[in-house]
Regions:
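Active-site/acyl-donor-binding loops of N-acyltransferases
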Residues: 2, 9-13, 37, 135-164, ...
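A conserved beta-strand-loop-helix scaffold within acyl/acetyltransferase catalytic domains
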Residues: 3, 7-54, 58-70, 120-127, ...
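Short catalytic/ligand-binding loop motif for oxyanion handling, primarily in non-cytosolic enzymes
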Residues: 68-73, 85, 124-128, 303-305
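A short, internal acetyl-CoA/4′-phosphopantetheine-binding micro-motif in the GNAT/acyltransferase core
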Residues: 78-91, 160, 263-272
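Short, flexible/disordered intra-domain loops and linkers
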Residues: 87-93, 123-132
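Short secondary-structure subsegments characteristic of cysteine-rich extracellular domains
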Residues: 89-110
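Aromatic (often tryptophan-rich) hydrophobic motifs at membrane interfaces
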Residues: 97-104, 222-335
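Conserved GNAT acetyl-CoA-binding A-motif
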Residues: 108-124, 286-297
Length: 369
């Protein structure tokens, strides 16, 4: 199958981004803008396009970094690989073609690689994975289940319905909270990048209160500067009638899907229910702007999970992360080093709990640096 492999050069971003945006599913983490974000932290991108079966080509933006002093590089395909379509009948050829591309072209471009981690945004038991077809295909191609880096489940809101139907999908109490915030004079505004400092202050307060790790302010500026020029990012604030920002969301888009990976609120925002109005407006205006789905990005637990479920949508469980081990010793050493790094970072920031590599969002993905 090697004669059908195509290596997309790093500067062919327009072709690549079009492929990802048209994929089913596609993810903002597979866009060239995300590679631009991660390049600041020493990650390089290798874009692979393989196979040409019934489901079309399968491709992945592979982020690669060699953490010192290890001699191996780690490779990660965040929310990929992606394809124009997935079917149970075509899964075996697709997985095999992508594994071959990793073993050959990736080694050629990136050198000594311990393992490649993938986490395709495919629903477990969904149409593509009927009777476990994709999971069987991944195993047959040499992949094995691995610890997750990104959320292994989420809640997706279908924006095909009209606004009245979306409003009706909110729990009654949630609609009351939205109206309460409006009555209190809370408004939602789109903002420019010059307000990222305010975003970060609220996000930091939220992280300290909830006990999760976030990155530096510059990291979120990098996200904004990579996606916003292409019309793929929005910064929203819920403000009191006095103009005080009390809740915020940073949204990112790929194709028809809007994702909310970052957001938070102040204590005052919680008291005024501004966060309810903010999320409703994010959903409503995303539909207005032509989006077809809204990803709440993870299910979380406890109060956050309860909050998200009140906005409707459908709970989706993904196939999870899978490793293609290219060097068994390197894979073992990398795993131990990553776990130790997470513990050190949690202690440095004074956060309780054991933590894990997945809790740290895994370098090439979310809030890890």
């Amino acid at each position: 199958m090697s004669d059908r492999l195509t290596n997309l050069h790093a500067d062919d971003t327009a072709t690549w981004d079009a492929f990802v945006s048209d994929a089913r599913p596609g993810s903002y983490l597979q866009l060239s803008s995300w590679a631009q974000v991660k390049a600041v932290n020493g990650w390089s991108a290798v874009r692979l396009l393989a196979g040409d079966g019934a489901d079309g080509p399968i491709g992945g933006q592979v982020l690669v970094r060699r953490p010192r002093p290890l001699p191996w590089a780690f490779a990660y395909v965040p929310r990929g690989p992606v394809a124009p379509g997935w079917s149970p009948g075509g899964a075996a050829d697709a997985a095999s073609a992508f594994a071959e591309a990793c073993r050959s072209t990736l080694r050629e471009r990136a050198g000594r690689v311990s393992h490649v981690r993938v986490d395709p945004e495919l629903e477990e038991g969904g149409p593509a994975d009927e009777d476990g077809a994709v999971r069987r295909a991944l195993r047959a191609a040499g992949f094995r289940p691995a610890p997750p880096i990104h959320p292994n489940a989420s809640r997706i809101i279908d924006l095909a319905a009209d606004e009245d139907a979306l409003w009706g999908d909110l729990r009654k109490k949630w609609r009351q909270y939205v109206n309460k915030a409006r009555s209190a004079g809370v408004t939602v505004v789109d903002a420019d990048g010059d307000r990222l400092g305010e975003f970060y202050a609220i996000y930091r307060e939220t992280a300290d209160r909830a006990g999760f790790l976030i990155r530096t302010e510059q990291a979120y500026r990098d996200v904004w500067e990579a996606f916003a020029p292409h019309g793929l990012a929005r910064l929203l604030f819920a403000q009191t009638k006095d103009g005080e920002p009390v809740a915020t969301l940073l949204l990112v888009r790929c194709g028809g899907r809007v994702v909310e990976p970052y957001g938070g609120m102040t204590a005052a925002g919680g008291d005024s229910r501004a966060n309810y109005l903010l999320k409703w407006e994010a959903i409503r205006t995303s539909r207005e702007q032509g989006a077809t789905s809204y990803d709440l990005w993870g299910l979380a637990t406890g109060g956050i999970a309860h909050f998200k479920t009140g906005f409707g949508g459908r709970e989706v469980k993904y196939l999870g992360a899978w490793d293609l081990v290219l060097d068994p010793l390197g894979r073992q050493v990398y795993g131990a080093a990553q776990a130790a790094r997470v513990q050190i970072e949690r202690r440095r920031r004074g956060l309780s709990g054991g933590g894990s590599a997945s809790a740290f969002a895994g370098d090439a993905g979310g809030d890890a640096a």
